[in-house]
Curated annotation (Swiss-Prot):
Pfam families: Pkinase. ATP binds at residues 376-384, 399. This is Serine/threonine-protein kinase CBK1. Residues 218-256, 265-275 have a biased composition (Low complexity). GO terms for cellular component: cell cortex; cellular bud neck; cellular bud tip; incipient cellular bud site; mating projection tip; nucleus; serine/threonine protein kinase complex. SMART domains: S_TK_X, S_TKc. Its EC number is 2.7.11.1. The keyword Metal-binding does not apply. GO terms for biological process: budding cell apical bud growth; establishment or maintenance of actin cytoskeleton polarity; regulation of fungal-type cell wall organization; regulation of protein secretion; septum digestion after cytokinesis. Protein kinase that seems to play a role in the regulation of cell morphogenesis and proliferation. Belongs to the protein kinase superfamily. STE Ser/Thr protein kinase family. COT1 subfamily. Residues 50-111, 177-275 are annotated as: Disordered.
Length: 773
């Protein structure tokens, strides 16, 4: 408030602001800095009586201002300088009746501006005899004026003249006593601005000095009561002054109305927000509330999250695989003594394959890219077709899965696990996956076509295997199961239907629909949480598991089959019936380990139980716990110690029976639980088997094909009499209707995309695979 642009004394008695009086027409300079000069110039007033009278009045005025200062600010504010009026020449002030002094007013009735620094003076020093610096006669006025103008031009631009304080060129300004008549004028210089600072000595003494000094910042102290007054502005024409007064009155009238319109709660909230912003140690906290968003927005956000995660996972995985292929080729080239030109050709060939693979990854496959040759298999959730790719003419087996049934039957985890197993290995013991894609209704797995059929077809055709043939197929099954376990998966559905025969007569495992890798995406609970399924949805569609959702198996429930095991003919009838059972929504529990039924946890050793059941069927002719009803089959499996028997009319070796009994036993006593596949390989039944070269050995049976599309080893005749499942038939009708209406089936819904994000896959070496016919 003090020491700023304007310095005024405030009269607490009448509420008026004290302003310095207008000076004589003679211009005065404020004291210069010590470097310029050490003397002050002043106009000597000849009337000594008026000077004495003025001095006495000034003493009274200083006492009154000191009292006003103490009353307004209190005794504690010692750092605030006391305000003193300027010391004008004699006769420039007039005394009014109440004893207070007010500046003289010009003819227009306006108080003259006090923006000029030259109006501020201390009490003048005493006259020093005939010293020309402090006195002059009337004849020296013009000479003194010239000297002042010359000094003003030499000093800094912040030295001003008294005439700059008068506004609008108002006429003559005459004081009350009429002794001084000043011709006012307004200066246009941009430097005519008030700039006054005070030194510490001035503040401590309570006297104002016109000496220019650097500003001294005082520490801010709280004021108990502060009075704000508007500083005087330069005079304006009467018309502009009236407009400003009207605007101020309107603002004052509108301010209470606006304050009354603001609710008290909002005012308090604003104050709290301002207080928090002013607090330097406060932090901003954000609360995540996705539940406030709509369901569609939440689904889209979840889809974006999964897509981003899958994108970076696949990108990193591809970069690692590409680097490994480069290192592998360079290592191979380094082991041969080939020329640099040949090595360069090999590296260039690899680079070309990498480029082709990148283009393939960017290509979106669809059902229209394949031509269906024949349906070679049907199941509960889809079917298997023999297809031919239109652009290359390659033959593949296409497995089609219905998305809606995956939701209803809680098969989302199993589908993801099957895709991960097929895409995560290049083992010769597992069916190769070349592509995988999807549309709005189906999931598609493009796999290699194995024309030899499956092991069930061979059992139906030959009924029994010899021990040598059984040893060969069981040895290859052990190597295939070992590969699955090394990948970190459990098949859980090893049966003759899932053991396929390739074109050379060797076996490969397929149908990993019930496999699990103990990954979060292989757990049914992961997809339940992802889709936020409630209890109503579970009751309407998904099965209500009695235990862990990841242990759910659709092959546990079977239809009742009336069987009598009196002769081989009836066994063949049972096998054909069981083939039909594989095409229906029910499955077969004949090869399931008892610990899976109990929901008490199981490990990889459950697959070795299934191996023992298949070995029993190859040597005896039927499964070890075959019964007329599924309940009886379940009872026999749970009581295997009493129900496992070997018929007397079928002769098998002691080693074969011992291996079967050691596989069909309790999990903690089962062969392979401690040492894995190596423990089974060391059994006497497999004595003489070369485990490293068994795949190069000629197989007991090599399928003979008439063409690459020959399907004689598949039960295509039986499939003609097997109707499509209701879900598949309904989906086919919906697809036809969508095509008629011009709707693209490839436009996926967001909800159905969530569990299948990342399902698309393309194999790198698809162009060089010899298994693709």
């Amino acid at each position: 408030m003090f020491g700023g642009e304007y310095d005024h004394a405030y009269d607490a008695n009448n509420g008026q602001r004290f302003q310095p009086p207008v000076l004589d027409a003679m211009e005065f300079e404020k004291p210069g800095s010590p470097s310029v000069g050490d003397h002050f110039l002043r106009q000597q007033i000849s009337n000594q009586s008026l000077h004495d009278q003025y001095s006495s009045h000034m003493e009274q005025q200083q006492q009154q201002q000191q009292q006003q200062h103490n009353a307004a600010y209190g005794a504690g504010f010692t750092d605030i300088p006391q305000l003193h009026p300027s010391t004008p020449p004699h006769g420039l002030v007039q005394k009014i009746s109440n004893g207070n002094f007010h500046p003289a007013m010009n003819q227009g009735g306006n108080i003259p501006s006090t923006s000029n620094m030259n109006n501020m003076f201390n009490t003048p020093p005493p006259t020093m005899g005939n010293n020309p610096l402090y006195s002059h006669d009337n004849n020296s006025t013009n000479l003194l004026q010239d000297n002042l103008n010359q000094a003003r031009s030499q000093f800094s631009p912040d030295r001003y003249s008294v005439d700059s304080d008068f506004n609008n060129g108002a006429g003559n300004h005459v004081m009350a006593n009429g002794n001084y008549n000043i011709n006012g004028s307004q200066s246009s210089s941009p430097y005519h601005q008030p700039q006054t600072f005070y030194t510490n000595s001035n503040l401590s003494s309570g006297q104002l000095s016109a000496h220019r000094s650097s500003p001294q910042r005082q520490p801010a102290q709280p004021l108990q009561q502060t009075t704000f007054t508007q500083l005087p502005q330069p005079s304006l024409p009467p018309q502009q002054q009236q407009q400003q007064q009207q605007q101020q009155q309107q603002q004052q009238q509108q301010q209470p109305k606006f304050q009354s319109m603001v609710p008290p709660q909002q005012t308090q909230l604003q104050q709290q927000q301002q207080q928090e912003l002013q607090n330097a140690g406060s932090y901003m906290y954000f609360e995540r509330r996705p539940d406030l968003l709509s369901k569609s927005t939440q689904d889209k956000a979840a889809a974006v999250k999964l897509k981003v995660e899958n994108y970076y996972q696949q990108s990193v995985k591809y970069a690692i695989e590409r680097n490994e292929r480069r290192v592998e080729l360079e290592t191979e080239l380094g082991s041969h003594n080939w020329s640099e030109e040949r090595n360069a050709r090999q590296l260039a060939s690899l680079g070309k394959k990498e480029s082709q693979f990148l283009r393939l990854r960017r290509t979106r496959l669809s059902l229209e890219d394949f031509h269906t040759v024949q349906v070679i298999g049907k199941g509960a959730f889809g079917e298997v077709r023999l297809v031919q790719k239109k652009d290359t003419g390659k033959i593949y087996a296409m497995k089609t899965l219905l998305k809606s049934e995956m939701y209803k039957k809680d098969q989302l985890a199993h589908v993801k696990a099957e895709r991960d197993v097929l895409a995560g290995t290049d083992s010769p013991w597992i069916v190769s996956l070349y592509y995988s894609f999807q549309d709005a209704q189906y999931l598609y797995l493009i796999m290699e076509f194995l024309p030899g059929g499956d092991l069930m077809t061979m059992l139906i055709r030959w009924q029994l295997f010899t021990e040598d043939v059984t040893r060969f197929y069981m040895a290859e099954c052990i190597l295939a199961i070992e590969t699955i376990h090394k990948l970190g998966f459990i098949h859980r559905d090893i049966k003759p239907d899932n053991i396929l025969i390739d074109i050379r007569g060797h076996i490969k495992l397929s149908d990993f629909g019930l496999s699990t890798g103990f990954h979060k995406t292989h757990d049914s609970n992961y997809y339940k949480k992802l889709l936020q399924q409630d209890e109503a949805t579970t009751k309407n569609g998904a099965p209500n598991d009695a235990g862990d959702g990841s242990n759910n198996r659709q092959t546990m429930i079977v239809d009742s089959i009336n069987l009598t095991m009196s002769n081989r003919q009836q066994i063949q009838t049972w096998r054909k019936s069981r083939r039909l059972m594989a095409y229906s929504t029910v499955g077969t529990p004949d090869y399931i380990a008892p610990e899976i039924f109990l929901y008490q946890g199981y490990g990889q050793d459950c697959d070795w139980w299934s191996l023992g059941a298949i070995m029993y069927e190859c040597l005896i002719g039927w499964p070890p716990f075959c019964s007329e009803t599924p309940q009886e089959t379940y009872r026999k499996i749970m009581n295997f110690e009493q129900t496992l028997q070997f018929p007397e009319d079928v002769h098998i070796s002691y080693e074969a029976e011992d291996l079967i009994r050691r596989l069909l036993t309790h999990s903690n006593q089962r062969l392979g639980r401690q040492g894995g596949a190596d423990e089974i390989k060391s059994h006497p039944f497999f004595r003489g088997v070369d485990w490293n070269t068994i795949r190069q050995v000629e197989a007991p049976y090599i399928p003979k094909l008439s063409s690459i599309t020959d399907t004689r080893f598949f039960p295509t005749d039986e499939l003609e009499n097997v109707p499509d499942s209701p879900a598949m038939a309904q989906a086919a009708k919906q697809r036809e209707q969508m095509m008629k209406n011009g709707v693209n089936p490839n436009q996926n819904q967001v909800k159905e995309d969530l569990p299948f994000i990342g399902y698309t896959y393309s194999r790198f070496d698809y162009l060089t695979r010899k298994n693709a016919l």
